[in-house]
Regions:
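Pre-Walker A adenine-sensing motif
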Residues: 1-14
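Hydrophobic anchor at the beta1->P-loop junction of P-loop NTPases
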Residues: 22
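Conserved lysine of the Walker
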Residues: 30
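Hydrophobic positions on the alpha1 helix immediately C-terminal to the Walker A/P-loop
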Residues: 33
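Short glycine-rich substrate-engagement loop in P-loop NTPases that contacts/grips substrate
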Residues: 45-75
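Conserved catalytic/switch belt of AAA+ P-loop NTPases
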Residues: 88-110, 114, 124
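Interdomain motor-coupling "hinge/lid" segment immediately C-terminal to the ATP-binding subdomain
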Residues: 105-106, 113-115, 119-219, 245-246
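Accessory nucleic acid-recognition modules appended to NTPase machines
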Residues: 172-336
Length: 404
């Protein structure tokens, strides 16, 4: 079993909050993680699991107050909780009643296939009672530490992406088929269930265009012209994909600057395996020969780093009108500012524009991540750090913050 890096943090939150929500796309492993967590509890306190998409489980909540009262001594896991928005008001009443009786934590674990913003529309009544944890697809630090297969494992993770069934498939072809079915299911079943009436083919076309333009600045007008819709419609569609944790808008650096800065966000399909499935890339050789290879690599590196960073880290990119650019800025809690340049080459070089950009923002650390697994200094105070090592540094900072 793969050890998810948020497990310890999740256990801590359950000791501190009455309810904890694990958010993430479908099939990312939320249910497996929840069962893994419940298995750590004693047999007498074993968790109860209800899938709100299952009619028999849903029937057990026909009188939720009675059900929760009958199982007041158990952790109750509620899967796909966004399907029953009226439940949040009930949970608030139960939590407040138990709090008055001296029970303050570890009562409910909520699993949802939507972002904090989307779920918050239904869960405002749980303010101060609910902690959020996002579960992302597998990242590099979660793979078994096997030096003999480390390179092949990393290549497979980049190609197939981190959804467990895609990464662990018996072959690249089987993985591609799973991802293509995943995309179809989201478009034809899951998104319509959330309410928006969006033509599946239109959304598929947009998603595919975003994959082609991985790591590029968003040009909504051009996308709108290609699809025959308005720029506002493109914005709404991308909002939805972001809410479903499938796409990321990486915002530009927002501090005051004397330079003329690019203001458009960069857009990434968050899972590299979905990028490749949308483009029909099933093998590592096909990926390396495709024009998207650079953008795919950049997006994969950025998602791994953001997933490992401490809470409250602000992620952005920096680009001036004359081309001085930093691929990823990580503003850490406490104010440190890491400027990360992503390179595909194993013998990376950086442009003068990167140095200018680092001076502009006052970067406290200048970093290059490439395909090389060696750590070495570069000219101009730059550190080349392998992805795995940099992720571990960020995780150490994250764990220190959580333990405080």
């Amino acid at each position: 079993m793969y050890q998810r890096q948020i497990l310890e943090e999740l256990s801590l939150y359950l000791q501190e909050f009455p309810a904890v929500a694990i958010l993430g796309p479908r099939q990312v492993g939320k249910t497996t993680l929840a069962h893994q967590l419940s298995a750590q509890q004693s047999a007498a306190q074993g968790a109860l699991y209800l899938d709100l998409e299952s009619p028999p489980d849903l029937a057990q909540l026909s009188d939720p107050n009675a059900y929760f009262a009958a199982h007041a001594d158990r952790l109750v896991i509620l899967d796909e909780v966004q399907r029953m928005p009226g439940l949040f008001a009930v949970l608030r009443g139960v939590i407040d009643q138990r709090r008055r009786a001296g029970v303050a934590s570890g009562q409910f674990l909520l699993l949802g296939s939507a972002s904090i913003e989307l779920l918050a529309q239904s869960s405002e009544s749980l303010a101060g009672r609910l902690a959020y944890v996002e579960l992302v697809p597998f990242v590099l630090t979660e793979l078994p530490a096997n030096p003999a297969s480390r390179l092949a494992d990393a290549q497979s993770l980049w190609l197939r992406g981190g959804f467990p069934q895609a990464y662990l498939a018996r072959s690249d072809a089987a993985s591609l088929r799973w991802r293509q079915q995943f995309i179809t299911t989201y478009l034809e079943r899951d998104i319509p269930l959330l309410g928006p009436r969006i033509p599946a083919q239109t959304l598929r076309s947009l998603w595919t265009m975003l994959a082609y333009e991985q790591a590029q600045m968003l040009n909504a007008a051009r996308l709108a012209a290609s699809l025959g819709v308005s720029g506002q419609t493109i914005g709404r569609y991308i909002d939805l994909l972001c809410d479903l944790l499938l796409v990321r808008r990486l915002q530009p650096w927002a501090r005051q600057s004397s330079k003329r800065l690019v203001k458009a966000p960069k857009v990434y399909v968050r899972d590299s395996g979905l990028v490749h499935a949308l483009l029909g890339l099933g093998t590592y050789a096909e990926l390396l020969s495709h024009p998207v290879v650079g953008g795919s690599w950049e997006g994969w590196i950025i998602e791994n780093l953001i997933a490992s960073a401490p809470h409250q880290t602000q992620a952005s990119y920096y680009r001036t009108a004359v081309g001085a650019e930093i691929d990823l800025l990580l503003e850490l809690p406490g104010g440190a500012l890491w400027a990360v340049e992503v390179k595909r080459s194993s013998a990376p070089t950086v442009s003068r524009g990167y140095h200018i950009a680092c001076d502009d923002v006052g970067a406290t650390r200048r970093l290059v991540v490439s395909s090389s697994d060696a750590r070495f200094p570069m000219a101009g105070g730059i550190e080349h750090v392998p992805l795995l090592e940099l992720m571990r540094e960020l995780l150490a900072l994250h764990q220190t913050n959580v333990a405080r």
